[in-house]
C-alpha cells in the first residue's frame, strides 16, 4: 500500500512508531490518501460491512473544522477513475451532530458503514480531504481495518 498518495495537496508525512506500532502522521493537511491499488491487488471486502480506524488530532483546531473520509472501490476494471468506481463518504467535525465529535488530543474511533458502496470487491483508496479552510493542521491515523 501507499500510505501517502499525494497529488494536488500540501499534506506532508512524518510517520512514526510507538512500541512497534506504525502510526500515519499527516501534517499541513488539506488532502491525502492511502492507496492500495498500485503494484498491489485491491482489497475484496465484499463480506465486510464497516471500515474502522482511530484518528488523533494533536494540535488545537478551529470550531467548524472537519475531516472528510472517503473509501473508493475501483469497480470491476480495478482502476481508480475507470468510470465504474463507487465511493462512500463520512465526515467527522466539531458539530454536535458528528459521531464521533472531533476533539483535540484524544484518540477517536471512527466506524464507517460501507454497505452503501455499489461494489466492495475492489477497494483501492481511502481519501482524507477537507475543502474547508477551518480544518486541523494535521492528524494521526492508526488501526485501520475492515470488519463485519
What do these predicted ranges mean?
Residues 1-148:
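Beta-rich carbohydrate-recognition modules and glycan-binding surfaces
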Amino acid at each position: 500500500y501507499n500510505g501517502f498518495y499525494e497529488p494536488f495537496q500540501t499534506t506532508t508525512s512524518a510517520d512514526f512508531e510507538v512500541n512497534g506500532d506504525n502510526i500515519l502522521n499527516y501534517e499541513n493537511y488539506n488532502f491525502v490518501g492511502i492507496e492500495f491499488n498500485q503494484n498491489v491487488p485491491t482489497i475484496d471486502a465484499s463480506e465486510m460491512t464497516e471500515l474502522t480506524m482511530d484518528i488523533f488530532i494533536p494540535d488545537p483546531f478551529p470550531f467548524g473544522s472537519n475531516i472528510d473520509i472517503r473509501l473508493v472501490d475501483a469497480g470491476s476494471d480495478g482502476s481508480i477513475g475507470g468510470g465504474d468506481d463507487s465511493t462512500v463518504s463520512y465526515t467527522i467535525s466539531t458539530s454536535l451532530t458528528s459521531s464521533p465529535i472531533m476533539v483535540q488530543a484524544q484518540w477517536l474511533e471512527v466506524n464507517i458503514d460501507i454497505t452503501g458502496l455499489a461494489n466492495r470487491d475492489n477497494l483501492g483508496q481511502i481519501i482524507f480531504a477537507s475543502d474547508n479552510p477551518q480544518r486541523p493542521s494535521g492528524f494521526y491515523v492508526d488501526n485501520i481495518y475492515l470488519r463485519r
